[in-house]
């Protein structure tokens, strides 16, 4: 099941504060990942276009995130649960009734209703078997002689270093 919560409509104070902390680049981190104090003198003071782009991507991502674990779960009452169960079962019944023709088909195609007569009949003449073998050999030969000639390169380089 999915979540129908939209962050654009309702924001709690805690959500706004979390977003503000995520989006506020002026608050420096307290510690580096390795536990050492960060060196602020080595950071460049001017933001580049790339950093501005990354910040805007981060802002868009943070505004579009839906925290499913923080969303209040809407519990269903017993009658709502039973109504949904009935609704789903009627939908399944409608869908399964349209697929009943698949259940009626035999697992293997039936060429005859009396296979014992086919098995007891005369075998296929040897000349017919030879003719089918020759036709299959000609078809195999024709297929094996199919060639694709390259007229131009498949991959073209665009002079990118």
Swiss-Prot record:
Modifications made to the protein after synthesis: N-terminal myristoylation and palmitoylation mediates its recruitment to lysosome membranes, thereby promoting localization of the Ragulator complex to lysosomes. N-myristoylation by NMT1 is required for palmitoylation at Cys-3 and Cys-4. May be palmitoylated by ZDHHC3. Ubiquitinated at Lys-60, Lys-103 and Lys-104 by UBE3A, promoting its degradation by the proteasome. Ubiquitination at Lys-20 impairs the association with the lysosomal V-ATPase complex. Deubiquitination at Lys-20 by USP32 promotes the association with the lysosomal V-ATPase complex and subsequent activation of the mTORC1 complex.
Protein name: Ragulator complex protein LAMTOR1
Membrane association type: Lipid-anchor
Organism of derivation: Bos taurus (Bovine)
Entry GO CC: late endosome membrane; lysosomal membrane; lysosome; membrane raft; Ragulator complex
Lipid-binding residues (covalent, N-myristoyl glycine): 2
Single GO term (MF): protein-membrane adaptor activity
Location in chain, cross-link Glycyl lysine isopeptide (Lys-Gly) (interchain with G-Cter in ubiquitin): 20, 31, 60, 103-104
Residues bearing the modification Phosphoserine: 27, 42, 56, 98, 141
Lipid-modified residues, S-palmitoyl cysteine kind: 3-4
Segments of this protein annotated with the region Interaction with LAMTOR2 and LAMTOR3: 121-161
Annotated compartments: Lysosome membrane; Late endosome membrane
Keyword terms, alphabetized: Endosome, Isopeptide bond, Lipoprotein, Lysosome, Membrane, Myristate, Palmitate, Phosphoprotein, Ubl conjugation
Keyword Transmembrane: no
């Amino acid at each position: 099941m999915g979540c129908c919560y939209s962050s654009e409509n309702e924001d709690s104070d805690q959500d706004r504060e979390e977003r503000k902390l995520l989006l506020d680049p002026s608050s420096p981190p307290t510690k580096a990942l390795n536990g050492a104090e960060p060196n602020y003198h080595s950071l460049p003071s001017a933001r580049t276009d790339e950093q501005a782009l990354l910040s805007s991507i981060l802002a868009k991502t943070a505004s579009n995130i839906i925290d499913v674990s923080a969303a209040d779960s809407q519990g269903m009452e017993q009658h709502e649960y039973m109504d949904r169960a009935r609704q789903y079962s009627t939908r399944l019944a409608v869908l399964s009734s349209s697929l009943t023709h698949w259940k009626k088909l035999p697992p293997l195609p039936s060429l005859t209703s009396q296979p014992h007569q086919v098995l007891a009949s005369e075998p296929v003449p040897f000349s017919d078997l030879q003719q089918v073998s020759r036709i299959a050999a000609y078809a195999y030969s024709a297929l094996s002689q199919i060639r694709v000639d390259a007229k131009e390169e498949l991959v073209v380089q665009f002079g990118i270093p």
